[in-house]
Regions:
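Active/binding-pocket-proximal capping segment
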Residues: 229-242, 413-455, 485, 496-501, ...
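Fungal secretory targeting signals
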Residues: 1-23
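Histidine- and aromatic-rich segments of cupredoxin/plastocyanin-like copper-binding domains
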Residues: 92-99, 103-106, 161-162, 170, ...
């Protein structure tokens, strides 16, 4: 070895040692229990508390730290934690989605999440079992980085969360939403919109100071606009991806999306300025008269000065023009990936099945959880792990080969927007349906427009990257990534109501490499045993013949041809009308018999048939005929 080579090797080793010494283990102990909260001042309700407190703690770590979260489930229902945006490279067992990478953690049990934080930026954590994070189990996760390109450009930092809020527990809302009486799938309307889990709050700032603001939409449904009156800011990060700084004044933040911005305050302290969040009313089927869509909090320069309300109305909000995230350039200037080795094209549809409920579909498949967590199927399947069949039809599995360039084309056959998130990756955003109005988010109100591989916009040379994108109504979106992270990764709509309807599919990435590199900890098996869930076999829990899917969990059957949601509504109300009509006839008949019986009382004693309720009903039936 030459002297120069030896010096380089020693320098690299020293740098690695220095970084290793700086890294630390950060431990959080989470005891989940129900607590009472009233963040909007309108209604008390139960929420998921941690260590008896709500709002929940913001997790803060440095890049390179080991994060350990010891969760004790003191609730009366199952729970998990997903650390949204974490790649979990080599630690797929720590990703958190129930029945994909682990079993749900039953009441009374403990579960430890333990992984190295190899990323930086703005993230969040939330429950990833059926209907739990709208009950308050969600909060920001901030990863500090002393080597961020903008590290020396600010003096202080703050975290801002925005979310929708329901006064009713999801266990009560869910049966109304997934119901024969809601065939069109109208989502529950929130009761309020929160800012840092409260309302009418202030962020105290100093004059002539630059702040790094971490913005996170931790809601379950509604996207929100964000701006600060008479201020601009510089975008420097989206979803954990550093960007070349770009000035903006308004952001559109869907659920699960994040931004970091640099805000430099004014020199004077004579007034305070509204921080405005505006719920996207286009997502709501109706707007209750008491629902406050536009909410004002304050950038507070002077606590003694007035705190003015924002100069915004519902009508004016329709004219807001947010910054287009597709135009951002990652600071690493990663070029467009080469042509894909695999293209996956799917279409979003919202339809009804034979039970009359409204479901969500990707290519006519509504995601249905398997009987065995998918990661465990991979690990127990041997050579058959590369066969998509063993994972079941209704998990909508896509087996990806290691290091393939994958392109997902998502067409939207629905009139609503859908924020889609891919676990385990960020991706290049390379194309989106063209707008049909003055701004990039105005789309055709007519027939859906599908992606045409032979006639599309020019792909950007350096595409923006993030892990959650907004699929436009009746349009399309195209993303591209490298399958370099072996694991089971969920790809799903992050509107929690839509996920409950089945709007998701699964990427089974490099199953052979998973078997070689991953190890399932014993706590996983213990958790499954407590829940009575098998830990081996195919999607139907068949360990003898992995290609036999008999008994797999499946979506309900299809409606007969020609049935529509409107037809279901008509049928339901026709049946109800018929039942009510029969009831009125019965009541009328009984009242008529009673009238005749009363008329005969003066002249003769009551007969046995008149005193016998069964005979009265028989008489009424005879009268009805």
């Amino acid at each position: 070895m030459t002297t120069v080579a030896r010096r380089i090797l020693l320098a690299v080793a020293a740098l690695w040692a220095a970084q290793s010494c700086q890294a630390k283990t950060v431990t959080y102990n989470f005891n989940l229990t129900w607590v009472t909260a009233n963040p909007d001042g309108l209604a008390d309700r139960k929420v998921v508390g941690i260590n008896g407190q709500w709002p929940l703690p913001v997790i803060e770590v440095d890049k390179g730290d080991q994060l350990v979260v010891n969760m004790h489930n003191g609730l009366d229902r199952s729970a998990t934690i997903h650390f949204h945006g974490m790649f979990q490279n080599g630690t797929n067992t720590m990703d958190g989605p129930s029945m994909l990478t682990q079993c749900p953690v039953s009441p009374g049990l403990d579960f430890t999440y333990n992984f190295t934080v190899a990323q930086s930026g703005t993230y969040w954590y939330h429950c990833h079992t059926d209907f739990c994070y709208p009950d308050g189990y969600r909060q920001a996760l901030i990863i500090h980085d002393s080597e961020a390109p903008f590290h020396n450009d600010y003096e202080e930092e703050m975290t801002i969360t925005m979310s929708d809020w329901y006064h009713t527990m999801t266990e009560d809302l869910a049966p109304q939403f997934l119901s024969l009486y809601n065939p069109t799938g109208k989502e529950p309307i929130p009761d309020a919109f929160l800012f840092n889990d409260t309302m009418n709050s202030s962020l105290a700032v100093k004059p002539n100071t630059t702040y790094l603001l971490h913005l996170v939409n931790i809601g379950a449904f509604v996207s929100q606009y964000f701006y600060i009156e008479d201020h601009t800011f510089r975008i420097v990060e989206i979803d954990g991806v550093y960007t070349d700084p770009v000035e903006a004044d308004t952001l559109y933040v869907s659920v699960a999306q994040r931004y970091s911005v640099l805000l430099t305050t004014k020199n004077t302290t004579d007034k305070n300025y509204p921080i405005v969040t505006v719920a996207d009313s286009a997502l709501l089927d109706k707007i209750p008269p008491n629902l406050q869509l536009n909410n004002t909090n304050w950038l507070e320069y002077n606590a003694a000065a007035d705190h003015p309300q924002a100069n915004i109305t519902v009508a004016l909000a329709k004219d807001l023009i947010p910054f287009d995230d597709m135009t951002l350039v990652p600071s690493d200037h990663m070029p467009l990936l080469p042509d894909p080795d695999l293209e996956i094209e799917v279409t979003v549809q919202m339809m009804n099945l034979i039970n009359g409920y409204g479901y969500a579909f990707l290519n006519n498949i509504s995601y249905t959880a398997p009987k065995v967590p998918i990661l465990y199927t991979v690990m127990s399947a041997g050579d058959l792990a590369t066969s998509s069949e063993i994972y079941g039809e209704f998990t909508h599995p896509m087996v990806l080969e290691h290091n393939q360039v994958v392109q997902i084309v998502l067409n939207n056959g629905d009139t609503g927007t859908h924020p889609f998130h891919l676990h385990g990756h960020n991706f290049q955003m390379i194309d989106r349906a063209p707008s049909y109005g003055a701004t990039f988010y105005d789309y055709l109100n007519g027939d859906p427009v599908a992606y045409d591989s032979g006639n599309h916009s020019a792909f950007p040379a350096i595409p923006a990257r993030r892990d959650t994108f907004v699929l436009p109504p009746q349009g399309y979106f195209v993303i591209r990534f490298v399958a370099d992270n072996p694991g089971v990764w969920f790809f799903h709509c992050h509107v929690d109501w839509h996920l409950s309807q089945g709007l998701g599919m699964v990427m089974i990435e490099a199953p052979t490499q998973m078997q070689e590199r991953l190890h399932i900890p014993q706590q996983h098996y213990d958790t499954c045993q407590a829940a009575g869930i098998p830990v081996a076999g195919n999607a139907a829990a068949n360990t003898q013949n992995l290609l036999d899917l008999s008994g797999q969990n499946a979506q309900p059957g299809w409606l007969p041809d020609g049935f529509t949601a409107r037809g279901i509504v008509a049928l339901v109300f026709s049946c109800l009308s018929a039942i009510l009509g029969l009831g009125f006839i019965v009541v009328y008949g009984l009242s008529d018999l009673k009238f005749h019986a009363a008329s005969n009382t003066a002249g003769a004693p009551a007969t046995a048939s008149a005193a016998n309720p069964e005979e009265q009903l028989e008489g009424a039936a005879g009268y009805r005929d």
